[in-house]
């Protein structure tokens, strides 16, 4: 037995620590569902149609809430507003808790249940209540009538226009027998879904009781498993720094599944930044299924990627799947969930084709019935892409978030919580709508004038890093608020016109800006500048996204951040969770350090002042010396495409490409080209293969070239991001907040790219390889202190002894 313990011992300890319950022989399983979710799921029909301004903006929702209260306040003392209604429905093997809140109960001769819906549509043209709205009110009416022993009850639908405040009402009186028969018919439709949920729950919980870790633990792996498990049960976030090859995916998924078995977690969200890591997560869940786990997962794919149409235009006139989608989708969902456990992209596409439904929308609905959801960060953290069904403001769930390759989340989150407006877009849209709506045209003109005023304040014209920090943009925001309301109504009233998509795009940009503006605090910088086209823009730049991410994390119970490159961990704590006291563990590499050589070349540098042909020749010679030590496959990572191209041209001239086969990454590789590039590393060759790649690009992380597919990673430069306005803003911001601004803006992001590229080598116990860092700056303490602990045996080389040291390594390895 090693010091990490055997698999069975660890599983027994987890059982003891959890005091895992049984499946509940004496207590029925409970299904909780809201009235609104019930009727919207069971009674939906018709088409997908995106030819509106989309979901109501926060401003419109706020206006709707105000209108609700206004209407309720006018109704008199007999009107009781916001009445919570709930009922427990007992079935053989489970109980359904149905709950909702009626907008109003009116005490008249016949009690009236009032349901209010506010909108920008012309409600005076309505001839009857919409079916789903009526059904929601009827459910409330049934619950109230049953609990108050009423013979009759009235349902009132109140529709109100947010612009004109015009109101139209529809009243229907039901006997209790009528509404009971109707309600039972609705529940009869839902029962097959409830039966499925209850049966799956029992099978899942039973299987978890006997689930063991599927492998013998590697060094450090048990530590991850136990730490993740304890953190979830303690409802604490944790950061896990663990090198490639430890098995981070299975080591986080397994304890999260065991936590599901305790009842502390209902659903696991496995969050990734790249498609390849989603596949690894799918495989990990599949390994557990082969070991007896009954656990259903779905992988969500971006709409643009999974859409089968040439253009992603979601309306019945442009897409045959959108037409009648909601008439067919429930049958498709039931077929999928009753026949599949691992619902991958391919599975989604297969059933979506069969039932002619939108694969993206179907996958979101399927997630409701799943135990695990594998998806991009966006679906949990992005304010617009996040799954509203789980992460609506004020609603929490028993969710565990597993964040893979968490180092990527810093920049992704900055993008999610920033917003930008470009002055020229207002002028372009004004030209489109000027003959259609004077009101919209005037609102656009007002915003353009506000942008022009800010432009005059901008100190820059053609100077580098000529941004201007803005203390406030309140006048612009007021104009944007008026424009948003005007555009929302205009787009709802005008479903088809030339260049409508451009107007819709501006509407979304304005809405995003206003929503993000509400989040602006001390962790934001508002600035203006000119883009590469010379266009003036204003940006709300989120320099520290931790507060926004924390709001999202609080919708679940615990978040596990893990990566091979979370150094220094306090930097990531500060920018991701905002809590320096969050748990953290460091896992040492399980691999034999004698099987790899890490070296630093002391007489080259990629500094801008040193970028010349002489320096490039020296770099090329060192690459030749490193590669000559052993025939095989290598990757060389350059700090930019420009340097890659310059050195490649030099390699041709110097005869380097005759000695070795060289393939170059290009700036616009499609998925197929990426696969072809990686496939070159699978072919046996007479001479060494060298891939010229860009540091921080698609081949420097997230690829898995095991065994002899890659035996060397040569990294040129320290990975520092290019100096630009936003990097300088970050640097100044952190300097002003008592941090080392250069570290936060440049050094830490750069070293992360270096460590990721180095991690492409040594993926398994059988691997051998060399990692060569070609830049004298790596010898400095401020860089070496960012090295992983296992790099304590780094060798210093130069252009004279590099070949000798590398050949010595390969001779005795």
Predicted feature residues:
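Metal-dependent nuclease catalytic cores that hydrolyze phosphodiester bonds in DNA/RNA
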Residues: 2-110
